[in-house]
Amino acid sequence: PLLCMHGQAQAQEQLLGFDSLYLSNTVLGLKFSTQTLAAKGKNVRMRGYMAPPLKPESNFFVLTRDPVAICPFCSSDAEWPVDIVVIYAKKTVVPINFSERIEVQGVLEVGSFIDPVTGFVSQLRLRDAEFRKIR
C-alpha cells in the first residue's frame, strides 16, 4: 500500500517548463500564467541548469533554462530574468558543472520575496527541493 501511495504522489507532480511560467512580461511587470498560479504551494518538477552560485556550498541555487557560465543576476541594474527560478534545497548543495542538465523537485512559491540572509529578490522559488542529474 505504501508503494502505491508514493507512486500516486509522484505521478501527480506537475512538470513546469520555463515557457509556461509567465503569461506576459510588459512594462507593468511579470504576469504569472494560470498554470503557474494553479501549481502554487504544490510539489512540482522543473528541468534546467544550475547557475554558478553566489557562494560555494549553500542551501540555494538558481535554476536556469539554458546553461550559463557566469552569474545571471549579478549586474546591479539587471531586471528579473524570466528564465530563472530560485531553488531552496533541503540540504547544502555542492555545485555541479553548469552544463549538466538537472531535474529539480520541490514546493512552488509564487510572488516577490526578499531573502532575509542574502537580500536576493526572487519571483519564483522551489522550497524543500532536491535535484538529480538527467540526460
Where are these regions (language model features)?
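N-terminal signal peptide c-region/cleavage motif recognized by signal peptidases
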Residues: 4-6
